Amino acid sequence: YYAYGESSDREILNDTDYLLSLTSGVSNPPFMVIDDGWQENHRINEYNGGPWKRGNGKFPDMKALAEKMKEKGVRPGIWVRLLLNEDRKIPGEWRISHNGCLDPSHPEALRYIREDVERICSWGYQLIKHDFSTFDLFGKWGFETNFQTEASGWNFYDRGKTGAEIVKQLYEEIFRAASEYHAVIIGCNTIGHLGAGLMHLNRTGDG
């Protein structure tokens, strides 16, 4: 399911019915994934980050929506962009200086990210698709990178770790948080070899 943008809980439930009509008789319940567009501060074609504490007006109750999806017979999944977050309560030192995204090398920022994953899983979502982390960390898409991916003039909070170690630490924390709820992880715009064993699926694309 790949349908980001304008959506609503009603549209998700209608699409759930359609998905079930295509999978009638299948013993393994399909996943129905809510893509970008559900989050509180979503602004179409402008902003697709957090906070990830609640849905917007078209998604008034994310926990109830997951329950309705389960009642229909699918396994609820959801999309998140964990590092882009405009919550004004987040301290500046938790952010990467060159773009303002969360810096997972900072222990408190990493804990904040983990809490977001735990919250979403606690609502009843059994699949987490985390997206954009490579771009949000390094400011480049896959086709733009080379052997030197980092721009000059900035650094992560923890200067004692390499970029690869920081990326893997992020993947590990997401995986541990989701595993407490037996949730499946899809990586999107992730670095494949660093995510080995820490993602159940890796969406092909610009990673």
Give the role of each language-model region.
Residues Y1-Y18, L22-F31, D35-E40:
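An acidic-aromatic substrate-binding cleft motif
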Residues N28-G207:
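Aromatic- and carboxylate-enriched substrate-binding clefts and catalytic-loop regions
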